[in-house]
Amino acid sequence: MVCTDVLGRIEREVIKECSPTLAGLKTGNLFNYRYDNISDFRKELASVNRKLNAKGVYVTFLKRNEKSALLYVFRPDRLEKDLSQPAVQNVLKTFGYTDYKVGASIKHLKQRVGENTCFPHEIGLFLSYPVEDVIQFIRQKGCNYKCCGVWKVYCDEAFSQKMFARYRKCTEVYLRVFDLSLIHISEPTRRVVI
């Protein structure tokens, strides 16, 4: 049995790092999660998935070692829509993606994360980053951007700044509510107007 303090810790981390995804504002979020042992981590991951899957949110690891895992928290329905866009498929094709279904694309992303020394930049397409910004990030090698927030912005700065503010506000609200013990991952999702 996993200690409830540990489950509270993973829940708080998911809320802290992934509130925009939990609220339905983004397709996915990514964060590094540290744990003490792999057995407890597997139980924590299973517990969080049991609570979130009913709400249409899933958690998987893209890479892990003995003490930490790179977790991807995502909404498969939104990811499916994102992956169906021709512009997204064109970018993914250049990185060896051939099947644009959710499961196959995540599997290929895991392979790319695991085998590359440098982070696969197409990951932004799995995180609701605008495709134009992902393309320019790759072309510009991360330089010459207009502004930087959740991602480096090359195109629509006003839109991106607005989204960054919404994501920050969402995270603040979700953390405040969680810290007041008014909501936990296992409770029904409440839409927060941001």
Where are these regions (language model features)?
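Short, extreme N-terminal leader segments that mark the start of a protein/domain
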Residues: 1-33
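Hydrophobic/aromatic-rich, well-ordered segments within soluble, folded domains that form packed cores
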Residues: 120-147
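Single conserved hydrophobic/aromatic residue that forms the stacking wall/gate
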Residues: 183-194
